[in-house]
Amino acid sequence: MLGNFQRSELRIEVPAAAKAIRDRLVSPTDLSKWLFPQQLSFPNNEALATGTKFQSSLGPVIVEQVVDYIDDCCLRLRLSQGIDGYQEWSWGDGWVQSRLEGISLLPLNLYQTATLFRLQQALKPGE
């Protein structure tokens, strides 16, 4: 894999309960909405579960993702192709945290910041 090893960990406040955050992170329909303009391809429309494989793409960059672990307050994804590494989400009432580590040519910190901002916007009342 070409690129540099990068590590980023961000935590933000969100106007939502833990259940609402989880729902946005494990529903393929919700993920596709708030991660736009990324294109997501899921095997079905069921909630993510351990072992679920899916693909995301942004322009020519494709990232294969596999759900490594999931519970009521944590989601861990193994990443390959455009990013070789992992992303871990954890959350609680009023906050969400994302840790992203991997080798990539992409600026992962910028990607992660934009992703968290989009999630924060999607969790605002009325969204």
Predicted features and spans:
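Hydrophobic pocket/interface hotspot
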Residues: 21-25, 31, 54, 67, ...
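Hydrophobic ligand-binding cavity/cleft-lining segments
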Residues: 1-45
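Glycine-rich portal/gate segments that line the openings of hydrophobic small-molecule binding cavities
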Residues: 13, 32-36, 40-86, 111-114
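Beta-strand/loop substructures that line and gate deep hydrophobic ligand-binding cavities in soluble
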Residues: 74-127
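Generic serine detector
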Residues: 8, 27, 32, 41, ...
